[in-house]
């Protein structure tokens, strides 16, 4: 469906839970956050109903996120349900990778096409400092499993944090020469309770790119990678993978935004950084028809803003795991 700014909205990101088995320093406080009661979170069947309605108005790509989506009980069943919808041509997953290896084969059989891993360090000790949990070896095993199953393109999402992992950017770049992996450096976003901390540790993508070019020389920009995202991709000479940058803060990509976000408790957000939400949980539980749900989704698309205004300050106290990354 085309919105008011001539953007084709064809991509729905679904947060299936606000729970997570890690406690990343930029995402939530050490004690975690107040969890949404299970009764308030949509069932897998309700998520599938939303997908069916959304597909009627042009949604073609689905990404399952969290929290950590793989902690959701019976999550494989949701992939199976979505894959039966012939209008959906791409089903992807964003995960921290802790549980992925043991579920990977079942997920692929259920319809998973590709996977993104959140991995902010290649050093187990630094990884533990960032996640407050560790389990680096589990994550690395999951990445290897995704490559083995050819869930291409396999992407690594690296949140760039000054003083934490900025000394590892070259190591991530070298990784793309060794294996067919696509590393994306993501600018730290000032979201939720971690807002002041994030502002002080921000690194612009341009600074990262400049540092890599000083080390490796000019990077090739004639690169395309499968996906619906906003990353700009580069590659090192003779590399098997690519290096990408997601510049949500320094150079927003709102003009090309093609997505909606559905929170675990059934609120549809036209913009991740906006305040407006459209309630789908209530009509779902009141027996709304597929057509009625599609009308609500259409309304949300009509209200999608031209761009975010995060530079004016983040006023939502919820953290990313609660909204859906």
Curated annotation (Swiss-Prot):
Its EC number is 4.1.99.22. CDD domains: Radical_SAM, Twitch_MoaA. It is an enzyme of class 4 (lyase). GTP binds at residues 13, 63, 94, 155, 259-261. Pathway: Cofactor biosynthesis; molybdopterin biosynthesis. It catalyses: GTP + AH2 + S-adenosyl-L-methionine = (8S)-3',8-cyclo-7,8-dihydroguanosine 5'-triphosphate + 5'-deoxyadenosine + L-methionine + A + H(+). [4Fe-4S] cluster 1 binds at residues 20, 24, 27. It comes from the Bacteria. Keywords: 4Fe-4S, GTP-binding, Iron, Iron-sulfur, Lyase, Metal-binding, Molybdenum cofactor biosynthesis, Nucleotide-binding, S-adenosyl-L-methionine. Binds 2 [4Fe-4S] clusters. Binds 1 [4Fe-4S] cluster coordinated with 3 cysteines and an exchangeable S-adenosyl-L-methionine and 1 [4Fe-4S] cluster coordinated with 3 cysteines and the GTP-derived substrate. Residues 4-219 form the Radical SAM core domain. Its cofactor is [4Fe-4S] cluster. GO terms for molecular function: 4 iron, 4 sulfur cluster binding; cyclic pyranopterin monophosphate synthase activity; GTP 3',8'-cyclase activity; GTP binding; metal ion binding; S-adenosyl-L-methionine binding. One of its GO terms (biological process) is Mo-molybdopterin cofactor biosynthetic process. Pfam families: Fer4_12 (PF13353), Mob_synth_C (PF06463), Radical_SAM (PF04055). S-adenosyl-L-methionine binds at residues 26, 67, 118, 189. [4Fe-4S] cluster 2 binds at residues 254, 257, 271. HAMAP family: MoaA_B. Catalyzes the cyclization of GTP to (8S)-3',8-cyclo-7,8-dihydroguanosine 5'-triphosphate. Belongs to the radical SAM superfamily. MoaA family. Monomer and homodimer. This is GTP 3',8-cyclase. The gene is moaA.
